[in-house]
Amino acid sequence: MAPSRIPSNRPFFIPPLRSWGLGLILLAPPAAWGDCTTLAQDIQTAARAADLPALAGHARLIPTEPTCPDDYRAKLARVAALGYIREIQQRLTAGEPLAAQEDLLRQSVAIANTWQAQALLGDLALDRKHYEAATLAFQEALNLINDPVDTPKAPPEAEIQSIFRKASECRLLAERYVAVPVNHRSGTAEGLALTAVRGWAVQRVPLPVTFESGSTAFTAKGEQAASDLADYLLKQNPPDITLVGHTDDRGSDQENRVLSKRRAEALAAYLREQGYEGRIRTEGAGESQPIELDDPDRYTEEEIWALNRRVELVRR
């Protein structure tokens, strides 16, 4: 079942103020930290009151306050950044458009990069049909959620699924192929390549492997996506995968099932040529399994057709 849509004007999950930054109130700085204690109190007060001018002034002091340990600076910055998000969500709930909040979003990210800000930036790009930028923002939100240091308290699973779904949709619609980000410390692929996000297991990933019309030949974007998938599989080396081809609802059901199966097989053959030795199952679903969209009203009929013409990677 598809998770319920989480519209951009619905308040994001933001932990209670006492839990922002791993409990800045419950674990206040010791008195020996001097001015850092005062700064923490000032930031919390301004965040509660949504006093953005005061919050901005206090946030500017975080990098240079000598009595604050470095790890505590990051927590303070996150509290200040989420103060902006709190105000933005109040404005959205009051009916203001998301586009009018862009400056505040940028100010929030300049203080600390939070998943809430990146998800809203993704929604903003999606509303403008800037699909490449939206994909990047949503993937960054997923990475931040998956990092317990950046996000001590994970959002509800439905929120994670919604962001993952929007990231997948935007990557399918982007004119150019958008690669998944790679963690430069660990070398592992993240974003839409994550197999789990804070306990939510990713079982199906729509791949932007596109084909020429009525053909099993990759488009330029499709070839890039197939190459990236091969690199990922060679590094991760899963013992088996399933590829499911899908089509839109134009044409006969039988023709679509045959074409979708042939396309899944074409991708499987390419992966074997690139050296992947795991077992590959291929299926052709034709038009029988339309993509479950986060919000169908966002898209034109042509875009929905494009979203349905996909190959899915299924993890068992």
Model-derived features with residue positions:
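Single-residue signature of alpha-solenoid repeat helices
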Residues: 55, 100-101, 134
